[in-house]
């Protein structure tokens, strides 16, 4: 059974900073990678150490999608942030977050 994808309200402002091409790449990756087994660690998905953003990360080249999964019967993946990573800093919207 597939997971439902939900976006936090703040993600809309994160998408505005990305190019149209990057938005399409991110949305395609979210659909392909997170609708089935979002809690399975793969080459592109990994659980994160405790941080201020989210418990899971989806890597798409230099782009990052941070998300959490609501277990149980709801089966919902909630995308909390989308940004671009450069070394140990992620730019989310217009804000830089140090990881």
Model-derived segments and their meaning:
Residues 5-6, 57:
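Short aromatic/basic micro-patch
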Residues 15, 19, 38-41:
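Flexible interhelical turns and helix-capping residues at alpha-helix boundaries
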Residues 32-57:
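A short, surface-exposed loop/turn module that caps and links secondary-structure elements
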Residues 2, 16-17, 24, 28, ...:
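Enriched for short, Lys/Arg-rich terminal
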Residues 5, 46, 77:
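A broad, low-specificity signal marking well-ordered, structured residues that form hydrophobic/aromatic
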